[in-house]
Amino acid sequence: MNPEQLKKRMPDAAFAFRGYNVTNLGRSTELLLHVAYGPIVQSCLSEAGKVCSDVISKKVNLVARVRNHRATTLQTYSEAIALVMAMEKAQVSLLSEFFGIELRSAKTCFGYSLGEISAVAAAGVFDCFEAMRVPLAMAADCAKLAEDCTLAVLFFRGESLPLAMIRQLCLEVNQAGRGVVGISTHLSPNSVLLMGQGDTLDRFKNVIDHCVQERVHLRKNSKKFPPLHTPIMWERNVPNRAASIMHTMPDGFGLPNPPVLSLVTGKASYNEYNAREHMYRWIDHPQLLWEVVFETLKMNIETIVHVGPEPNIIPATYSRLRDNVEAETNGSIRMRALTAVVQHPWIKPMLTNRTALLRAPLIEQVVLEDWLLENSVA
């Protein structure tokens, strides 16, 4: 997709910002060393490094880290936060500066986990470097909480997971007083991410196996992640401490432009004054990724622009949905006809919400760091 084509697609596009992951560099080194892009990238990394240094009271040089392609770890979690947010700001700035494509010309934007803070900042509600102070101030405690936590994907072959039952079973496991488990992300109708301390995931699996007829699968991740978006964050009073910092954070008033779909609520719920409330709830509330993905389908989004280094969860979600829809509709004349029909705006209001799923194979995904390098300017 060339620059002119991407610009024309903006009215029906959504920008998707990635969150923290075990890998956070992507192609940032290439962008930093690029003869034209380099100055903007260096400026963003330098400013983010100064903010990070100020918050954690330790010298941080993100420019050197990226130039040397030195990966972050859980022990440098604060630097990972600053790096990801800086590169997201840099990528959006490059798109504007060199191609005249503005984020505000898109229909909407959203972000997974840390990405929601970047999205809200990019939409003009907060300054990016001021907003990153909040997660940076909590980074040490988040990393410490990760030491005894395990991330796992829970999925089964039925039509949809019984979310209410899962929430209740988590509470019952927590009631035993031997650790906390909770939903971190609603990935799809039949899968969620869970975060659990100690052996809570095993005990949860044992309980749910006796409560549902369908076979439930639990796949653990060997990597360590901070237990964001779960009640585990209560243990170090992280939500309230973050909220206290936000009292005096500059800006935060006015509607985001474009509208931001919040993974806290699953919809475009930001108004002129509730950005701080959303950021507070963001810390310990599950990420409603599936609800937001489905919302983009209902909004007739045709292009997803993925922002940040090496985005993974959001692109994978759309790709998996596309593959599933194509598998279900393959060979069906009726389904192929409906897929063609939903391309016509006049008939969309006449169709049920579920028909929006048929749009999944039509969505084009653009990984911004790849696109910037493929459409490189001298």
Give the label of every model feature segment:
Residues 20, 123-273:
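Alpha/beta catalytic cores of group-transfer enzymes, especially the acyltransferase/condensing modules
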Residues 40, 49, 56-68, 158-176, ...:
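Charged, glycine/proline-rich intrinsically disordered loops and linkers
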Residues 32-33, 209-211, 320-323:
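Short, solvent-exposed amphipathic alpha-helical segments in soluble enzyme
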Residues 2-110, 194:
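Helix-rich "cap/lid" substructures immediately adjacent to catalytic or cofactor-binding pockets
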Residues 107-115, 119, 123:
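Gly/Ala-rich beta-loop-alpha elbow adjacent to hydrolase catalytic centers
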Residues 215-303, 311-312, 343-373:
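Acyltransferase
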Residues 17-19, 48, 88, 115, ...:
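Conserved small-residue
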Residues 312-324:
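Short Gly/Thr/Asp-enriched flexible loops that form oxyanion-binding sites at enzyme active sites
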